[in-house]
Amino acid sequence: FYERKEIKDMMAYLQVVNNPADEIRLRRIINQPKRSIGDKTLAVATEIAQGIGETLFEVISHADEFEALKRTSPKLLNFAQIIQELMKAAEDETVSLADLYELILEKTSYIEYLKTEYEDAPRLISD
């Protein structure tokens, strides 16, 4: 069960919401579902982050401030905004883990992604 891609993706989302500096999991989810943020863009953002001593998430959150990321900054900023909204929800003591999970599915359009990518989406969604 835990080896399935969609489970790993959701676990990675929860972990990034808890710790946005988790670059490994951030890289896993930045294009899940697809957001057209390429490896080259991530490499440039990583290089910037290392150069200025910030996390990859911080650079993504301020992508419009970096000339090398201007072209893809709307996509990066959109992703960062989703994560920031989820982080804010996670800090709210009235939001349960189940609520946060549902919010991740909603904000990321992950259910729609599963429906378009997998024939057995109804089974995946019910799990």
Task: Cite the ranges covered by each PLM segment.
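Conserved helicase C-terminal RecA-like lobe
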Residues: 4, 11-127
